[in-house]
Amino acid sequence: DLFKGGVKKYTDEELKAILANDQTPVFVAVAPSANDGNDAEHNADSPATDQVLGYAFCVFQQHLNSNILTDIKTLYIDDLCVDERSRGHHVGSTLYRYVLDFARQSGCHNVTLNVWACNPKAQAFYERMGLTPYYIGMEQVL
């Protein structure tokens, strides 16, 4: 397995720096509060009020004065995650569309991300959202 278990992706210090930086926007999907104007009845399967359902960590990228790359502004999604209990309830698609709208309003040419080849569900999700491959990273394990 490539990933360590039981560890956080960011330290507390890294997270504070990310949240304080305009170049690394973070978006969080939370369960609606009881007084959000929705008359739908709360049931045991509904998430608790203000519970985090998902998040997207993003980074603005721009390759200025590159010999080979055009000077386009990109919003790179470093991490998009939805709580396992909230998957299948359109949290990811709503969050992704919000990020897409933010990127458009910020003057970005495109939105990019990386997805692990060992995660076909994520690949299928991103394809449903309209993303297409533009770079393929390869490796040979020694």
What positions do the PLM features span?
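Conserved active-site alpha-helix within GNAT-family acetyltransferase domains
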Residues: 93, 105, 117-135
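Conserved GNAT acetyl-CoA-binding A-motif
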Residues: 104-114
